[in-house]
């Protein structure tokens, strides 16, 4: 801490101090609000809404609104928000990040700004990392909101459209980051406004904000369809790469690359996690695939497949980056160690790994819609978040999201002791010391949580503990089913738990054990079903007697265990509290801080220490070469720990290097995605205007004008006249649609004697006349089937434009992805790849817009609409049609149950309209 901070306090301390007056106002209202009846307290909600409508601001009513929530929390939840929680709530309302330590009650803090901002009626989104937390929090905190007269919604995977619309229409909506993002993309693929579920992005509170906005930032949300390309090339590329010789280096520079070209086919840069073919490797590829030059544009696809194959074999490691389970390659989250079901590496890397592991290679998918979390969350007018660890990423939150961080003091002083790291020369020496430390803690009953960076290491530590006769639990991506239960009991007397990274994050580790999970286990043993148990521990309103009885039984069982563990908790405190043992420093200091933060909740004692070796990846790849040489000269043996002070600077510098590199990678992803984001905003904004019923007839007329003008100007150029042959070539694709063949024949005969401008005007006049006739024919065909005052042609224009935009936008996404994959090579030509990507991406976007306009016009001229007479004849044919000789009578058929027509289903009359928009008599008799 610098001299300025010592004298004036840290920035966070100054920010917290500045809020003292507001918190004092809230606390001053406590007695007054405590005296209110339930009805009077609930009436505050309507009072606040009225004051906002009268011109007051949210800041004006904040003290009273927070005092209302505090009193409601006491009455409904039995919890009273502490002073520091009120401070956290104000920080969130201000659109900032509140860094609050584990166990400080972040879930309750969120209710304060959520209630205040929901009073505007514009909706508040509370975003969590998984469905379980979203459901649990919405039910538990939902009781408080409902008591105060606000509605609560829940958005999780598997809900139908109607349920989601209700959830988003609520005052406060809980859900996961994935579901909010996917719903946004699905809304922007809708053809009718009735299909939309979201109603805007006004205010979001993001729980575990660092996990969602930093760790997940590089992962794009993608809605995809089945691609058409064969998977054979992935297998061919993998078979080829399997025969190549690989060389691993800490980092690749130009000289190293030259020196290794003769003895390796590809080089793996362990620091950058990249793989590159050498000159020898390129030569082998050209021979194997019988091509002249791998760099030629026509070999781009092959080159891409080979590059992904060398990355799959050289960089991606089984049981670290992914696991193979039931014939599937499943990604392991590098930060939590959890399996990421349903997620796939993009750009063909997943298929390359499938080929490497000899499992079924899935077809490459076609991207229908995509957005990164970075750009999704930047849609919100106001964004805030909570986490226990954010300060180390302060620069990134500020640069990318314009969010600043305020560290909230703990309610009770932190009693955890963070010991200095111990560093060993080799991994073998380190793991021996790890087992000895665990044994020492275990003998005195001190619970230990061992944090590892991979499945591989967690299983190695587990084997060593088994050999040492130490009973323990292992928690990694392979054994995740009982994650919360195992982590919850990690604070019991003598417990030893080995876990990958932040497994079980979000579950409190209580000293002596977690009464809630112990009660669940007992009721399960007594035969209570998981379904009933979920209801028994839930908070949703119900009048079901079985559920009410189950809740009563659960409350009694939990109370019994709370009493039992009180004594055990005292024994654990005497033993020193929870001991956090890190087996390796993570690339990010934030992840290390998260691991430490599992101990010392709410003033409990605790201890933490990291055990390192010079062979750990972070020191091997990013540590100074000088340190390694120094250790050799000192002659330190494997079992003797090194002086940590000498290495502390090197370790921190190594972590800062990696953090800086990862930040630059995420920033680079954003620079590229910002190009797509600008284009996406244009497309989605125009789509929304069309969905909202904007009359686009004038836009269609402009498209028609532009399409016809481009026919002539695009082929005439500087010529005084257009030849007959050129005219024929220019207009062939619009023959039989915009123009009749006879019209084009007549104009073609006069083309070489008509100035281009005049020819363009005459063509446009003909096209406009044809369109007017087309409109008249369609209106006649649809007569009686449209709602009064609605035009069939206007509806057709709207639907066709949306469908064409979607088709071309999907193809454009793929084209931009391909452009980005190859744009990096521009750096060799002294060009900035991002600048080139922006320039070429803009050109491609303009070409797409022109193509959309022409295709929309063409389809409006060619789409077929059945006439009322055709529909009538078809119905008669269906009734009277017989095969073979009969007496001509219609045989009576058994009555069959026909599926009910949904309001949004196409009307069976053949009009092409939704049932609710169609007015035909045949299918609307009971309407």
Model-derived regions: residue spans:
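Residue-level signal for mature regions of secreted extracellular proteins and peptides
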Residues: 900-902, 911
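Short cysteine-rich clusters marking metal-coordination/redox-active sites
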Residues: 907
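Conserved P-loop NTPase motor core
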Residues: 1-613, 617-630, 635, 685, ...
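Conserved tryptophan-centered aromatic signature that marks the ligand-binding surface of SH3
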Residues: 912-917
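Extended, charged helical/alpha-beta scaffold domains that provide interaction surfaces
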Residues: 33, 322-330, 336-343, 573, ...
């Amino acid at each position: 801490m610098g001299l300025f901070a010592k004298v004036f306090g840290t920035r966070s301390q100054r920010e917290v101090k500045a809020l003292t007056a507001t918190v004092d106002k809230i606390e001053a209202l406590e007695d007054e609000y405590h005296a209110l009846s339930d009805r009077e307290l609930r009436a505050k909600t309507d009072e606040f809404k009225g004051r906002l409508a009268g011109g007051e601001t949210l800041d004006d009513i904040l003290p009273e609104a927070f005092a209302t929530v505090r009193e409601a929390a006491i009455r409904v939840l039995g919890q009273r928000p502490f002073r520091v929680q009120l401070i956290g709530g104000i920080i969130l309302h201000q659109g900032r990040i509140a860094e609050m330590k584990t166990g400080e009650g972040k879930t309750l803090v969120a209710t304060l700004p959520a209630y205040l901002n929901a009073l505007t009626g514009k909706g508040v989104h509370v975003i969590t990392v998984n469905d379980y937390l979203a459901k649990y929090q919405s039910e538990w905190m939902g009781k408080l909101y409902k008591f105060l007269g606000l509605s609560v919604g829940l958005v999780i995977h598997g809900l139908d459209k109607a349920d989601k619309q209700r959830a988003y229409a609520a005052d406060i909506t809980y859900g996961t980051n994935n579901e909010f993002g996917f719903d946004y993309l699905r809304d922007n693929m809708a053809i009718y406004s009735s299909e939309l579920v979201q109603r805007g992005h006004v205010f979001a509170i993001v729980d575990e904000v660092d996990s969602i906005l930093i760790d997940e930032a590089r992962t794009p949300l993608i809605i995809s369809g089945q691609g058409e390309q064969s998977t054979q090339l992935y297998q061919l590329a993998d078979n080829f790469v399997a025969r190549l010789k690989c060389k691993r280096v800490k980092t690749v520079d130009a000289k190293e690359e030259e020196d290794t070209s003769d003895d390796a086919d590809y080089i793996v840069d362990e620091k950058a996690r990249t793989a590159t073919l050498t000159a020898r490797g390129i030569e082998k590829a050209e021979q194997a695939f019988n091509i002249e030059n791998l760099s030629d544009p026509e070999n781009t696809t092959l080159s891409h497949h080979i590059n992904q194959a060398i990355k799959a074999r050289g960089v991606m490691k089984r049981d670290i980056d992914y696991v193979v389970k039931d014939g599937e390659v499943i990604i392991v989250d590098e930060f939590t160690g959890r399996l990421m079901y349903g997620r796939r590496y993009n750009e063909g890397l997943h298929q390359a790994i499938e080929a490497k592991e000899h499992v079924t290679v899935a077809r490459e998918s076609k991207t229908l819609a995509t957005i990164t979390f970075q750009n999704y969350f930047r849609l919100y007018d106001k964004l805030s978040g909570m986490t226990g660890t954010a300060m180390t990423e302060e620069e990134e939150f500020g640069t990318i999201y314009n969010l600043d961080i305020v560290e909230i003091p703990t309610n009770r002083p932190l009693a955890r002791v963070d010991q200095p790291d111990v560093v060993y020369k080799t991994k073998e020496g380190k793991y021996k010391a790890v087992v000895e430390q665990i044994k020492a803690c275990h003998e005195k009953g001190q619970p230990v949580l061992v944090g590892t960076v991979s499945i591989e290491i967690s299983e190695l530590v587990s084997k060593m503990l088994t050999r040492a006769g130490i009973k323990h639990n292992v928690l990694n991506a392979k054994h995740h089913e009982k994650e919360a239960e195992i982590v919850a009991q990690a604070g019991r007397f003598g417990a030893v738990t080995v876990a990958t990274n932040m497994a079980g994050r979000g579950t409190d580790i209580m000293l002596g054990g977690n009464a809630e999970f112990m009660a669940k286990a007992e009721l399960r043993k007594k035969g209570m079903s998981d379904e009933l148990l979920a209801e028994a521990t839930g908070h949703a309103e119900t009048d079901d007697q079985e559920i009410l009885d189950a809740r009563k039984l659960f409350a009694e069982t939990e109370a019994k265990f709370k009493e039992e563990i009180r004594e055990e908790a005292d024994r654990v405190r005497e033993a020193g509290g929870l001991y956090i043992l890190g087996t390796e420093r993570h690339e990010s200091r934030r992840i290390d801080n998260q691991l430490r933060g599992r101990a010392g909740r709410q003033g409990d004692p605790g201890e933490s220490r990291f055990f390192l070796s010079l062979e750990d990846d972070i020191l091997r790849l990013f540590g100074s070469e000088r340190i390694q040489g120094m250790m050799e000269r000192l002659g330190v043996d494997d079992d003797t720990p090194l002086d940590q002070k000498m290495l502390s600077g090197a370790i921190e510098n190594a972590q800062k290097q990696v953090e800086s590199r990862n930040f630059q990678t995420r920033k680079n992803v954003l620079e590229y995605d910002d190009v797509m984001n600008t284009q996406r905003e244009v497309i989605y904004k125009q789509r929304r205007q069309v969905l909202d019923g904007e009359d686009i007839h004038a836009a269609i007329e402009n498209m028609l004008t532009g399409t016809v003008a481009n026919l002539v100007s695009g082929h005439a150029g500087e010529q005084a006249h257009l030849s007959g042959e050129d005219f024929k070539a220019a207009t062939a694709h619009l023959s039989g649609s915009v123009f009749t063949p006879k019209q084009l024949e007549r104009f073609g005969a006069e083309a070489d004697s008509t100035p281009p401008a005049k020819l363009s005007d005459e063509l446009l006049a003909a096209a406009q006349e044809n369109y007017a006739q087309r409109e008249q024919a369609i209106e006649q065909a649809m007569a009686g089937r449209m709602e009064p005052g609605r035009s069939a042609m206007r509806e057709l224009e709207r639907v066709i434009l949306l469908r064409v935009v979607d088709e071309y936008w999907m193809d454009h996404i793929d084209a931009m992805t391909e452009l980005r994959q190859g744009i990096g090579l521009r750096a060799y030509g002294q060009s900035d790849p991002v600048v080139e990507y922006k320039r070429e991406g803009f050109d491609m976007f303009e070409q797409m817009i022109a193509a959309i306009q022409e295709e929309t016009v063409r389809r409006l001229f060619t789409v077929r609409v059945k006439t009322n007479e055709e529909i009538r004849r078809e119905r008669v044919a269906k009734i009277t049609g017989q095969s073979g000789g009969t007496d001509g009578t219609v045989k009576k058929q058994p009555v069959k149950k026909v599926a009910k027509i949904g309001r949004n289903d196409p009307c069976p009359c053949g009009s092409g309209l939704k049932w609710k928009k169609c007015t035909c008599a045949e299918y609307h008799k009971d309407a």
